[in-house]
Regions:
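A conserved helix-loop-strand patch within extracytoplasmic ligand-binding domains
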Residues: 47-97
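Pocket-flanking alpha-helical
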Residues: 13-47, 131-132, 152-157
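Extracytoplasmic/secreted envelope proteins and their assembly/folding machinery
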Residues: 18, 78, 102, 106, ...
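C-terminal functional modules
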Residues: 200-259
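A bilobed periplasmic-binding-protein/Venus flytrap-type ligand-binding module shared by bacterial periplasmic
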Residues: 61-71, 175-189, 212-213
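Ligand-binding pocket segment of bilobal, Venus flytrap-like solute-binding proteins
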Residues: 26-30, 97-166
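Ligand-binding cleft/hinge of the Venus flytrap
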Residues: 1-5, 80-120, 230
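C-terminal lobe and pocket-closing loops
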Residues: 150-201
Length: 259
């Protein structure tokens, strides 16, 4: 807005986001998680209806995790879990039933992978799983759970991700890269906005902080973003490099003034 544009933010499902870009209803989608969204996004990209602009977040994670004290005790891989079945009560704590993460855990159990055939996945919710973790950590009770980053859990708890679950969660600790997508032709029609979008990349630390402010402290998203950019002028400078206001003015002072 400080650059002179009038953006509109719509919260929609992933399939609707891609159909909307194809139909010119939406211009930009910042949440193309790959490879998990490949089956949805790739057909639009292959047909030339959507363009993949830039990777805006790298090294995201999604796999099993433990408190740091459990990791320090020698449980660093999913291969170490069965050896400590008693401490873990043969339970892997997940989130809501039917979630893809829970389904992957159940598949591990069904396959008797890593010696986990007689374990069980505990269906709960994100809040319920983290409440259980909060209750166990003060007494250093053992627990293995579904973890992911970015998420405030990474700053609220000392935790570590378990290696070697590649066959189920994928390589690099269930690694994902998030891309910015645009409707085909948008960058050519709005090159200045395209420059901004190309510059807008995020880090895990940044997103963990922002999500914690919003989810744990109740800060409004717009206010959380404003606070972060005010405290990190280097990020703002990098995002606005080569960008002008809509009428061709200097972008940086315009945005700094709005902050």
């Amino acid at each position: 807005e400080a650059l002179g544009y009038e953006p509109r933010v719509d919260t929609v499902s992933v399939p609707i986001a891609y159909a909307g870009m194809r139909n010119n209803d939406f211009d930009v989608f910042l949440g193309n998680w790959m490879p998990s969204m490949a089956s949805i996004s790739d057909p639009y990209i292959e047909r030339g209806e959507v363009e993949r602009l830039v990777a805006n977040l790298e090294d995201a994670k999604y796999t099993l995790a433990v408190p740091q004290y459990v990791y320090d005790a020698g449980v660093t891989s999913v291969n170490d879990l069965a050896e400590h079945a008693e401490q873990f009560e043969q339970r892997i704590h997940g989130i809501e039933a039917g979630n893809d993460g829970n389904e992957l855990i159940q598949q591990m159990i069904d396959d008797d992978a890593y010696g986990l055939g007689d374990w069980q996945v505990i269906d709960s919710s994100e809040a319920g799983m983290l409440a259980e973790l909060s209750a166990r950590v003060p007494n250093e009770k053992w627990m293995v759970f579904l973890g992911w980053e970015p998420h405030p859990m990474n700053t609220n708890f000392e935790m570590a991700y378990l290696s070697d679950a590649d066959d189920y969660f994928g390589p690099n600790l269930g690694g994902a890269t998030v891309y910015t997508n645009t409707r085909t032709g948008f960058i050519e029609s709005c090159p200045n906005v395209g420059e901004l979008l190309s510059n807008m990349t995020f880090t895990l630390e940044m997103e963990n902080q922002l999500m914690s402010a919003i989810m744990d402290e109740g800060v409004e998203p717009r206010e959380a973003a404003r606070d972060y950019l005010s405290a990190h002028p280097d990020v703002l400078e990098a995002w606005l490099e080569g960008v002008t206001t809509r009428d061709g003015g200097d972008a940086l002072p315009a945005v700094q003034s709005a902050l």
